[in-house]
């Protein structure tokens, strides 16, 4: 299971999930990726379950990159505990996910779009957030389509 080796503070506040991912929202390593469509918390167990599902499907065919890391501790109180007496102990670790964040990437010579799509579909079932399959070609096309429009807008003003 993924978790930080050491942290400066043992306990964190829960926080709010607003806005979209400004970092980690483009494909950096592979040819195919799984992108989050909504915000949420993904635990280290869910990340590991998704990784296992993908690895078992592609076998030794390609490489899988995990682009998220669970760095937020979630605390819980013992069952049937009275109110007060401080914050609970850290029970598990989560990664905070915002829409647009790339969760997993996949690439390699033997990985076809069909294999990658099926492996990512198996991983999707293990995750608590809505996701979509994207490829490097789709990302470049969407970036290429928006670039001329942005350039035209800057020329006119």
From Swiss-Prot:
InterPro entries cross-referenced by the UniProt entry: Ribosomal_uL16, Ribosomal_uL16_bact-type, Ribosomal_uL16_CS, Ribosomal_uL16_dom, Ribosomal_uL16_sf
Any GO CC annotation of this UniProt entry: ribosome
CDD domains: Ribosomal_L16_L10e
Stored PROSITE patterns: RIBOSOMAL_L16_1 (PS00586), RIBOSOMAL_L16_2 (PS00701)
Keyword Hydrolase in annotation: no
GO molecular function: rRNA binding; structural constituent of ribosome; tRNA binding
Keywords, comma-separated and alphabetical: Ribonucleoprotein, Ribosomal protein, RNA-binding, rRNA-binding, tRNA-binding
Listed GO biological process terms: translation
One Pfam family this sequence matches: Ribosomal_L16
Entry's family note: Belongs to the universal ribosomal protein uL16 family.
Subunit structure, as described in the record: Part of the 50S ribosomal subunit.
Chain's role: Binds 23S rRNA and is also seen to make contacts with the A and possibly P site tRNAs.
UniProt protein name: Large ribosomal subunit protein uL16
UniProt organism field: Synechococcus sp. (strain WH7803)
Lineage of the organism: Bacteria, Bacillati, Cyanobacteriota, Cyanophyceae, Synechococcales
């Amino acid at each position: 299971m993924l978790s930080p080796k050491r942290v400066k503070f043992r306990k964190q506040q829960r926080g709010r999930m607003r806005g979209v991912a400004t970092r980690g929202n483009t494909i950096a390593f592979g040819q195919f990726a799984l992108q989050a469509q909504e915000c949420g918390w993904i635990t280290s167990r869910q990340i590991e379950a998704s990784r296992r599902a993908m690895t078992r499907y592609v076998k030794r065919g390609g490489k899988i990159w995990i682009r998220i890391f669970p760095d937020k501790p979630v605390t819980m109180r013992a069952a049937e505990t009275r109110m007060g007496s401080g914050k609970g102990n850290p029970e598990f670790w989560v990664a905070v996910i915002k829409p647009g964040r790339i969760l997993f990437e996949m690439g390699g010579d033997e990985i076809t779009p069909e294999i990658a799509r099926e492996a990512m579909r198996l991983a999707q079932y293990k995750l608590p957030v809505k996701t979509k399959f994207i490829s490097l070609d789709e990302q470049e096309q969407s970036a290429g389509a928006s670039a001329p429009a942005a350039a035209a807008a800057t020329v006119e003003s």
